[in-house]
């Protein structure tokens, strides 16, 4: 038991180190994109905290898998310290408490704290009222989110997971079953339903941003950016052309005649365009003479290598996701079970790799962290390229050192939801690994063998799957949270197909696009000249 406790302690210590690394990453990440002129302490802390909570929750996944796998020997028997079922339940409950705590904090952030901070700064920008009036208005709008959260918790608590299978079951029987469900783990069901609903939104965000970013990020690294010198020459020609057009319009009023409304409107547009072109010229001049630009030329081969590596990883994910979904389509128990599969019929690369890495702790920890960070970076690439949209309305643009507090909160909210969906994405890629880790069990073969003594049954060592006996294999708490309601799993299944389609479309679009400007995102028509100070302090 002492050895087991020591190794369990090591697992939790690595989780603690990862927690500190997550906090450091979130701080650097948020500070990189927030506007230094409009930065606010509360919005910064909120963005860092919400993103960190999501990443910490995803970091519990390998701990959960490690604990259930560590309980068993390679020969399929439980270790001495884990033979007692109460001990196993106690260990798993520590993970369950962790999930309860973190998921509750996520609900608090999504439905109360982030909306409140967002609406507070919206009111601050729109009105010059007192702090009390701003807080009152923010609370009024936030109450709608609290109402939605309450409804989700109630639906999750009261929605029965099963219905009587008998044809002659009365409505009274169904109501009795409903209250029986309420009496057992209704808190878990309520929290699971709420988190699954958020994960569903995260799935839509992943389809929109992550799938596109997985193709856009590597191809942008491979193609590189335009040459600053030649881009500046083209911009100088555009400046001369616009200046000539401005002079032509102004020449019409040299004799004292006023300009027509059409000419005044055209002159205003040309002057705005000229202002933008001159700002663009200043930025191009800065990049042309900057030492960092010259260093980037030296680093160009490394960027190409990273781009090739990223596109190979993306293809590995897509192929694994396709094979996993195809396996569910051909061999699952059907849509009413959430497309659950018994065993693995079509193997995919990640489903083979993860159980192998899991035997050498903490290789799977590192791999899961890498997958999560990969999703973060590709999602960020998709958001940066597309901006934050609400249907056909573009709400915010995400730019380095230019992102407003409200946009930063939106950004971290989207990333939080995408990270929540990452756990299900990993399950889609390696369902056996997420459910049981590397657990094995001894299965008694029904066929008998004749021996000198008599007939005897053969014991076969098998990997744990959904058809395994409950007393022989321990299911991870992650799986219980993700698959408490079968209809969410069915929606995720179809969402995976949509993810694959969007990735292919994004890959084609990214291949057809040309190189990006060296000052991409630095100059926009709605920027002021003062915003240059943020780029060139």
From Swiss-Prot:
GO biological process: insulin receptor internalization; protein localization to lysosome
Protein task: Lysosomal membrane chaperone required to export cobalamin (vitamin B12) from the lysosome to the cytosol, allowing its conversion to cofactors. Targets ABCD4 transporter from the endoplasmic reticulum to the lysosome. Then forms a complex with lysosomal ABCD4 and cytoplasmic MMACHC to transport cobalamin across the lysosomal membrane. May play a role in mediating and regulating the internalization of the insulin receptor.
Protein name stated in the entry: Lysosomal cobalamin transport escort protein LMBD1
Gene name of this polypeptide: lmbrd1
Glycoprotein listed as a keyword: yes
Keywords: Cell membrane, Cobalamin, Cobalt, Endoplasmic reticulum, Glycoprotein, Lysosome, Membrane, Transmembrane, Transmembrane helix, Transport
Lipid bilayer topology: Multi-pass membrane protein
Record field: transmembrane: 8-28, 48-68, 99-119, 143-163, 187-207, 304-324, 363-383, 407-427, 485-505
UniProt cross-references to InterPro entries, sorted A to Z: LMBD1_LysCbl_Transport (IPR050854), LMBR1-like_membr_prot (IPR006876)
Residues on Extracellular side: 1-7, 69-98, 164-186, 325-362, 428-484
């Amino acid at each position: 038991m002492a050895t087991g406790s020591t190794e369990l302690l090591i697992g939790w210590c690595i989780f603690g180190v990862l927690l500190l690394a997550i906090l450091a990453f979130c701080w650097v990440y948020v500070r990189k994109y927030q506007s230094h002129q409009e930065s606010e302490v509360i919005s910064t802390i909120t963005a860092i905290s919400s993103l960190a909570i999501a990443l910490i929750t995803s970091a519990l996944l390998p701990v959960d898998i490690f604990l259930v796998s560590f309980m068993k020997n390679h020969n399929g028997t439980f270790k001495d310290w884990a033979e007692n079922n109460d001990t196993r339940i106690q260990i798993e409950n520590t993970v369950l408490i962790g999930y309860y705590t973190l998921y509750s904090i996520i609900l608090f952030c999504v439905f109360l704290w982030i909306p409140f901070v967002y609406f507070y700064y919206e009111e601050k920008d729109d009105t010059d009222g007192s702090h009390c009036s701003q807080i009152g208005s923010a609370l009024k709008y936030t109450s709608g989110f609290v109402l939605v959260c309450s409804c989700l918790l109630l639906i999750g608590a009261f929605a029965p997971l099963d219905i009587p299978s008998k044809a002659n079951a009365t409505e009274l029987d169904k109501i009795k079953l409903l209250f029986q469900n309420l009496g057992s783990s209704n808190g878990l069901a309520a929290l699971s339903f709420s988190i699954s609903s958020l994960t569903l939104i995260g799935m839509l965000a992943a389809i929109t941003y992550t799938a596109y970013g997985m193709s856009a990020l590597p191809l942008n690294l491979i193609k590189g950016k335009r040459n600053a010198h030649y881009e500046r020459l083209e911009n100088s020609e555009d400046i001369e052309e616009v200046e000539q057009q401005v002079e032509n319009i102004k020449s019409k009023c040299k004799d004292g005649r006023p300009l027509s409304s059409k000419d005044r409107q055209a002159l205003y547009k040309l002057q705005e365009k000229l202002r933008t072109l001159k700002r663009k010229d200043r930025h191009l001049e800065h990049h042309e003479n900057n030492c960092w630009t010259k260093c980037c030329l030296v680093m160009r081969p490394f960027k190409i290598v990273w781009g090739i590596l990223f596109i190979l990883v993306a293809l590995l994910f897509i192929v694994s996701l396709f094979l996993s979904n195809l396996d569910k389509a051909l061999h699952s128990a059907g849509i009413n079970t959430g497309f659950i599969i018994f065993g693995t019929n079509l193997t995919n690369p990640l489903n083979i790799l993860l159980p192998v890495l899991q035997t050498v702790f903490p290789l799977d920890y590192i791999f899961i962290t890498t997958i999560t960070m990969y999703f973060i970076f590709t999602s960020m690439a998709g958001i940066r390229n597309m901006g934050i949209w609400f249907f056909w309305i573009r709400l915010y643009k995400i730019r380095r050192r230019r992102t407003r507090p409200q946009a930063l909160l939106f950004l971290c909210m989207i990333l939080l939801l995408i990270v929540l969906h990452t756990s299900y994405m990993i399950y889609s890629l390696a369902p056996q690994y997420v459910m049981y880790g590397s657990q094995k069990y001894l299965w008694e073969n029904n066929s008998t063998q004749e021996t000198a003594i008599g007939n005897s049954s053969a014991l076969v060592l098998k990997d744990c799957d959904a058809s395994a006996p409950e007393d022989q294999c321990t299911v991870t708490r992650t799986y219980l949270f993700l698959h408490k309601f079968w209809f969410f799993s069915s929606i995720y299944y179809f969402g995976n197909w949509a993810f694959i389609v969007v990735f292919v479309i994004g890959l084609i679009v990214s291949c057809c696009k040309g190189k990006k400007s060296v000052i991409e995102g630095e100059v926009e028509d709605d920027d002021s000249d003062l915003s240059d100070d943020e780029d060139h302090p």
